[in-house]
Regions:
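Conserved catalytic core of two-metal-ion nucleotidyltransferases
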Residues: 25-85, 105-199, 204
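A short secondary-structure junction signal
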Residues: 86-92
Length: 204
């Protein structure tokens, strides 16, 4: 069931499907009931991932309390990306950090004084919100250029600095198993246990 300290459901999608979700949403979804939100040049939502919100509910998160966006019970959707090796991996993580900073547009906290100072400096260099989004989107293109089928590992680049370090064997996502969740049968990655141990350690 739900963890008592969490307030939403997290869903993974391969990068190509993740991008198609946002593009196809206006055509196929019940847009009166549900909103699909992602920061663009025209809309700032304060997240570095996509959020699907139930418009018939209210759930306001403190960092977003002043934003003019639908704020309700949400599903957070994260892309899965191919994970290269060597210098390409280092550059991928650098671009993921740039993406995260300029899309969230918030000084990093809880990562040490150096990261906080560098984040504040980088945001100060580009003060306009639209310019920050443009820089973030350019970094997103660079970090997501590696296809899953061309790599031996998978990573998650839109879940924050800690998780972008993780490298998951592709076998974790090679198939699907179904498990009961709150009375519903839900699909999970076949290697969910290995994934959870890499992401959270002794998660039980």
């Amino acid at each position: 069931g739900f963890n008592p300290w969490d307030d939403d459901i997290d869903v993974f999608m391969p990068r190509d499907d993740y991008e198609r979700l946002f593009e196809l949403w206006p055509k196929y979804a019940d847009t009166e009931r549900y909103s699909c939100l992602k920061t663009t040049k025209d809309k700032f939502i304060g997240n570095i991932f996509t959020t699907i919100v139930d418009n018939n509910t209210t759930c306001i998160k403190p960092p977003q309390k002043d934003l003019d966006i639908p704020q309700g019970i949400a599903i957070d959707v994260f892309p899965l990306d191919g994970c290269p090796i060597g210098i390409k991996r280092k550059m991928q993580k650098l671009n993921a950090l740039i993406y995260s900073l300029y899309i969230a547009q918030e000084i990093p906290k809880n990562h040490g004084p150096l990261v906080t100072a560098v984040g504040a400096l980088m945001l100060g260099i580009i003060p306009m919100r639209s310019w920050r989004v443009a820089v973030g989107k350019a970094a997103e293109k660079r970090m997501s250029r590696y296809k899953i089928e061309d790599c031996d590992f998978i990573t998650e680049l839109c879940a924050g600095p800690h998780y972008m370090q993780n490298e998951y064997p592709k076998r974790c996502f090679d198939g699907v198993v179904r498990k009961n969740f709150e009375g519903y049968e839900m699909p999970l990655p076949a290697g969910y246990d290995e994934y959870l141990h890499i992401a959270f350690g002794d998660y039980m």
